[in-house]
Amino acid sequence: MVAMFLAVAVVLGLATSPTAEGGKATTEEQKLIEDVNASFRAAMATTANVPPADKYKTFEAAFTVSSKRNLADAVSKAPQLVPKLDEVYNAAYNAADHAAPEDKYEAFVLHFSEALRIIAGTPEVHAVKPGA
């Protein structure tokens, strides 16, 4: 069921956050969220030719490295973003931990992408936009 929802979400473009377009960040928070999203998409790409049983382990290995870098950047550039990112990571890992082994990857991707979309919308709404 989760795999079917994820497939539909990917086709409809829901598995990527609004920051996927790139180039429109106006705050440090937005830039960091774009970096997190890019790392997330890159880690997803590493699973393209991996058997389903190994997707989560492959994804997690790639994503862990970039996640640590992104959190370190957030601490130094936008410390107010750290608790939000922690919540995103914790929700996604919790979903994966409670999923059946064959559904761990899909559960993580679904929860992470939706949580990232929510926090990506927050700074975008509150950012000061330059006058036209």
UniProtKB/Swiss-Prot annotation:
Range of residues in the leader sequence: 1-22
Superkingdom assignment: Eukaryota
Pfam families named among the record's database cross-references: Pollen_allerg_2
Coiled coil: none
InterPro entries recorded: Poa_pIX/Phl_pVI (IPR002914), Pollen_allergen/Os (IPR035506)
Keyword terms, alphabetized: Allergen, Signal
Keyword flag Signal: yes
Family: Belongs to the Poa p IX/Phl p VI allergen family.
Protein name: Pollen allergen Phl p 6
Protein source organism: Phleum pratense
Gene: PHLPVI
